[in-house]
């Protein structure tokens, strides 16, 4: 089956750097806004829960643990319905997530951002 690929060096993202290099709400980044999902909407059933024990959800990925042993991915915001985001926020559709690390070490955020990009977010 060929040779094993060598892992490429991950370059941390800079503060306020986007991949793709466009704002979150633009078509190139996330597609069209499809409308807010509420608990009573049909689309709510399409959301997929994540029960990964390596992720700490603020409301009580293995790549984070590989990068920093003992540190977990911390999701501070995912799907939301409380109305404190801008009107067409992707949080209301379950297409946006805010993340940190369990140790809240801001020096890791650039690399964390790069890991998210490499994972397809």
UniProtKB/Swiss-Prot annotation:
Ca(2+) 1 binds at residues 60-61, 76-77. The keyword Flavoprotein does not apply. It is found in: Secreted; Cell membrane. Ca(2+) 2 binds at residues 61, 77, 80, 82. SUPFAM superfamilies: Hedgehog/DD-peptidase. One of its GO terms (biological process) is cell fate specification. GO terms for cellular component: extracellular space; plasma membrane. Intercellular signal essential for a variety of patterning events during development. Signal produced by the notochord that induces somite patterning, dorso-ventral patterning of the brain and early patterning of the developing eyes. Displays floor plate-inducing activity. Binds to the patched (PTC) receptor, which functions in association with smoothened (SMO), to activate the transcription of target genes. In the absence of SHH, PTC represses the constitutive signaling activity of SMO. Belongs to the hedgehog family. This is Sonic hedgehog protein. The lineage of its organism: Eukaryota, Metazoa, Chordata, Craniata, Vertebrata.
């Amino acid at each position: 089956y060929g040779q094993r690929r060598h892992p490429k060096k991950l370059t941390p993202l800079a503060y306020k750097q986007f991949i793709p290099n466009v704002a979150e709400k633009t078509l190139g980044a996330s597609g069209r806004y499809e409308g807010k999902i509420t608990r009573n909407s049909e689309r709510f059933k399409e959301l997929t829960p994540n029960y990964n024990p390596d992720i700490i959800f603020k409301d009580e990925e293995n790549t984070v643990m590989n990068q920093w042993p003992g540190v977990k991915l911390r999701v501070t915001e995912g799907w939301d319905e409380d109305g404190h985001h801008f009107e067409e926020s992707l949080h209301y559709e379950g297409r946006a997530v805010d993340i940190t690390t369990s140790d809240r070490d801001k020096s890791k955020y650039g690399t964390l951002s790069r890991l998210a990009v490499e994972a397809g977010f």
